[in-house]
Design a protein with these regions (language model features):
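Cytoplasmic-entry segments and transmembrane alpha-helices of multi-pass inner-membrane transporters
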Residues: 1-11, 118-154, 247-249
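Alpha-helical transmembrane segments of integral membrane proteins
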Residues: 2-3, 94, 98-131, 160, ...
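Membrane-interface helix starts
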Residues: 6, 10-14, 63, 106, ...
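Residue-level recognition of pore/gate-forming positions within transmembrane alpha-helices
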Residues: 12, 43, 140, 156-157, ...
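Hydrophobic alpha-helical transmembrane segments of membrane transport/permease proteins
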Residues: 16-68, 162-183
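Membrane-water interface segments at the C-terminal ends of transmembrane alpha-helices
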Residues: 22-29, 58, 72, 138-168, ...
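Short hydrophobic, aromatic-rich alpha-helical segments embedded in or entering the lipid bilayer
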Residues: 45-78, 223, 272-283
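An internal, D/E-rich "acidic patch" concept
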Residues: 59-117
């Protein structure tokens, strides 16, 4: 297993290098540039000022030279400074947004897993029942409902029409004047709509995966043997079928790791949540190349790490993978 992990890690390095190079080239060749955002309404900006900014940002060099200079800094975890007038380090801007995105997505993932597993198990063990039909309908609705449409619908209903919940940000304008418990309630109320929207589609997908996985497991011979021995259905499902049915779900959870850091671009933009997703959108529209590349590197690295973690985890929970790899190695 250690040799397998090392081999996959070594293969991931050139892949990460290729991802960063292609991303850098695509971003550099995109229409417009940072100067279009820095001096859009200044017709008196002299040619000398623009040339100075171009030289300062290194935009006058060929793309491969710019990429090499960026790569040398990135290896030292120095992603440069933002092209915006504040000129703040990229890691500083990302560090300010990362805890918010991580907190929201961890809550979302915990809710999805906590609800999807029992929903999927019950749907599989009661196949074609009324419960199974209702959950199947919910899954189809969840897959077909766009996040942005659901977000706007809930904002209009609960925020505008009923006035029950706030629709943007993480705290109200008068937050500093509230008592401690009022501040906690205010923060919680701001989380309700984003978390509901984020978990709706994910819950539909995970519960469907769990149902399909459980259906495949309960048809296996060892499950039928456990039933033939007279074990109760509860024991058969909980002790014999559930563990093996969770294998695909473990893989999916590992692959969801990049999303915990990358954030949801749509949800954070609609609800004005200052997270990684909103930072990515703002950086793209302002052509802030260093921040865009910093986000892409983090997401790409986590994607490769997630694939490695998924493979290792699958081998740990499924002995057939470990012993099969040993036999092939011999």
């Amino acid at each position: 297993m250690a040799l397998f992990a090392l081999r996959r890690l070594l293969l991931a390095l050139p892949l990460l290098l290729g991802i960063t190079f292609v991303s850098y080239v695509v971003i550099s060749l995109a229409p417009g540039g940072p100067l279009d955002f820095l001096t859009p309404e200044d017709p008196n900006a002299s040619v000398e000022v623009k040339e100075r900014l171009i030289q300062e940002f290194g935009l006058d060099q060929p793309i491969h030279v710019q990429y090499w200079q960026w790569l040398k800094r990135a290896v030292r975890l120095d992603f440069g400074r933002s092209f915006l007038p504040d000129g703040r380090p990229v890691l500083t801007k990302i560090g300010e947004r990362l805890p918010i995105t991580l907190f929201l997505n961890l809550i979302e993932m915990a809710i999805i897993v906590g609800l999807a597993v029992p929903i999927g198990v019950l749907s599989a063990t009661r196949q074609y029942s009324l419960y199974d039909k209702i959950t199947t309908l919910f899954v189809f609705v969840g897959f077909a409902t766009p996040d942005f449409w659901l977000a706007l619908l809930l904002m209009i209903l609960f925020g505008v029409q009923l006035g029950w919940l706030p629709i943007s940000g993480l705290r109200s304008l008068n937050w500093e004047y509230l008592s401690f418990w009022q501040q906690q309630w205010d923060f919680f109320s701001h989380l309700v709509l984003p978390i509901v929207v984020a978990t709706f589609g994910g819950l539909a997908g995970f519960s469907r995966y769990m149902r399909q996985s459980m259906l495949e497991v309960v048809r296996q011979d060892y499950v039928q043997t456990a039933r033939a021995k007279g074990l109760s259905e509860r024991v058969v499902i909980s002790k014999h079928a559930l563990r093996n049915a969770l294998l695909p779900v473990v893989t999916i959870l590992a692959l969801a790791l990049p999303g915990l850091i990358g954030g949801s671009v749509i949800i954070e933009s609609i609800f004005a949540i200052p997270g990684m997703g909103q930072l990515m959108v703002q950086s793209v529209f302002s052509r802030d190349y260093p921040v865009v590349m910093g986000n892409l590197v983090i997401v790409a690295t986590l994607t490769l790490v997630a694939n490695l973690v998924a493979d290792i985890t699958y081998g740990l929970v499924d002995p057939r993978i470990r012993f099969g790899g040993r036999r092939r190695g011999r």
